[in-house]
A protein has these predicted regions:
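Cysteine-centered motifs
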Residues: 2-3
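GST-like domain detector, emphasizing the conserved glutathione-binding G-site
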Residues: 9-153, 159, 163-166
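Short helix-capping/linker segments at secondary-structure and domain boundaries
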Residues: 45-47, 140, 187-195
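Structural helix-adjacent loops and short alpha-helical linkers that scaffold large soluble proteins
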Residues: 106-108, 194-198
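GST superfamily/GST-like fold recognition
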Residues: 168-193, 210
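Acidic/histidine-enriched, glycine/proline-rich intrinsically disordered or flexible terminal extensions
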Residues: 223-238
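Extended, well-ordered alpha-helical scaffold segments
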Residues: 146-150, 198-212
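Surface-exposed helix-capping loop/turn segments at secondary-structure junctions
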Residues: 160-171, 215-220
Length: 238
């Protein structure tokens, strides 16, 4: 735990940078894809201009950068656009110092096949079941508990892994944990009473570890919605 806290506090040494030269990061605070990208950006100490958006009123600048209309979106100073959270995560690690990369090589994107498979399951089957569980009223022909049962197939896999190690792949935090955590958080809070009484005690403890962590609490700091004005420009890790 001490090593984990110390590693969060490490920050990349960089030369002074004008704020207008910073990468622009479009985010929505509660989006799980945006949360995992912000967590890694904060973990690495990568400086960005954060533009908090409302998904119901997406800014034209974001839509011009990425026609997908989803967050997160990262616009680099040279004009390159990254609009997939895992690509943004890999970019953030590329910006860190060599010392930080050595310390956190397990996080830098060179995933084992088992780690890659877990993230693919999370972003595919589990996310689909999660959406059905959370927004079941959109398709009422399938009851909510059926969506939850489908999602539980993934929870069961995670519970088994946590029976072997403190985190999903080992006794050390990995990119896999950060990539999956925001989605388990979203699932749990659909019906927190049910989740807290479910047969996943190890997953419950794993979730609480992240919810109480300095990394997550800093990541979830509230910022004003960006409207193009100087007052709504936010800068993190400067």
């Amino acid at each position: 735990m001490c090593c984990f806290i110390v590693s969060i506090l490490l920050r990349n040494v960089r030369t002074p940078m004008q704020v207008n030269d910073l990468p622009v990061f479009y985010s929505f605070r509660r989006c799980p894809y945006a949360i995992r990208a912000r967590m890694v950006i904060n973990y690495c100490g990568t400086a960005v201009e954060l533009r908090e958006v409302l998904l119901s009123n997406k800014p034209n600048a974001m839509l011009t950068a990425s026609s997908k209309g989803t967050v997160p979106v990262l616009v680099l100073p040279g004009g390159t656009v990254l609009d997939e959270s895992l690509d943004i995560i890999r970019w953030a690690f590329d910006q860190t110092s060599s010392d930080l990369n050595k310390l956190d090589i397990r996080l830098c994107g060179h995933l084992s096949q088992s780690g890659t498979n877990l993230i693919e399951l999370n972003d595919g089957m589990f996310k689909q079941a999660l959406d059905g569980y959370k927004y079941w009223q959109r398709s009422p022909e399938k009851p909510q508990h059926e969506h939850r049962s489908e999602a539980e197939q993934f929870l069961q896999q995670l519970e088994v892994l946590l029976g072997e190690n403190q985190f999903l792949l080992s006794d050390q935090l990995s990119l896999v944990d950060i990539a999956i955590f925001p989605f388990i958080r979203q699932f749990a809070f659909v019906d927190k009473d049910w989740f807290d009484q479910s047969c996943y005690p190890l997953l419950q403890n794993w979730l609480e570890h992240f919810l109480d962590s300095e990394l997550f609490l800093n990541t979830m700091a509230k910022y004003p919605v960006w409207n193009g004005s100087e007052e709504t420009r936010n800068f993190i890790n400067l």
